[in-house]
Structure formats: C-alpha cells, structure tokens
Amino acid sequence: MAARSLSGAVKSLCSAASGSLSCSIVLRRSYVATSQNVTAAGLSKGGSTRVMVGKMEQRGLDQEAESAWGPDPVTGYYRPSNRAAEIDPAELRELLLKNKAKSF
C-alpha cells in the first residue's frame, strides 16, 4: 500500500515540476532508470565509447567459440558441444547398487 501512495506522490510531483523533469523517467522503475543514466553518463565522455565497442566485440568472439552447437551423436539433434554426456537416473542407480552389492 505504501508503494501505491509513493507512486501517487511521484505522479503529483511530476505534474508539478514537468518543466525540468521528464515524467517518463520519473515514473519508470528505479533499476531501469538508473541503468539508463549510467549508460548515458558513460557515453557522454568522448573517447571511451570506442574502447567499450572493441571490448564488446572481443567478448562476442569469445562467446561464439564457447557456445558452439553440434549434432548429438545419439539423437542427431543439435546441442551445445561443450555439454557432458547425460546418464539415465535409472541406469546410474543400477550401477551404484551393483557396486554396493559386490563390496559385501
């Protein structure tokens, strides 16, 4: 209920001070507004955008190599190539029970 009253207060504040603040930014959720402000502040600093673009491209190339997909040899469906082989829970239980029976 406090959130609703806070929202009403923000709306009335926005209508009162519409000359200096954008209502759309004030009415958005706080995490969205702060992330946009950080991005806008980072891009307004002249030469830092080129460095960031280069780093983003390098990350993209690294991620493509890590997330390569390939056909599964058993089913033929595509899956991540760096994924371990799956084992059926029933088969795993059977293997574990056989090993315990032999140790006695």
Curated annotation (Swiss-Prot):
> Is Nucleus among the key words of this record?
no
Source superkingdom: Eukaryota
This protein's record includes keyword Transferase: no
What is a biological process (GO) this protein takes part in?
Answer: cold acclimation
Q: Mind listing the UniProt keywords for this protein, alphabetically? A: Mitochondrion, Transit peptide
CC per GO annotation: mitochondrion
* Location of the transit peptide in the chain: 1-31
| UniProt cross-references to InterPro entries, sorted A to Z | LEA_3a
- Localized where? Mitochondrion
**Pfam families xref list:** LEA_3a
The conditions that induce or repress this protein are given as:
Induced by abscisic acid (ABA). Accumulates in roots and, to a lower extent, in leaves during progressive drought in an ABA-dependent manner. Triggered by cold acclimation.
Primary location recorded for the protein, binned into one broad class: mitochondrion
Similarity section:
Belongs to the LEA type 3 family.
Q: What is this protein called?
A: Late embryogenis abundant protein 41
Question: Which organism was this protein described from?
Answer: Arabidopsis thaliana (Mouse-ear cress)
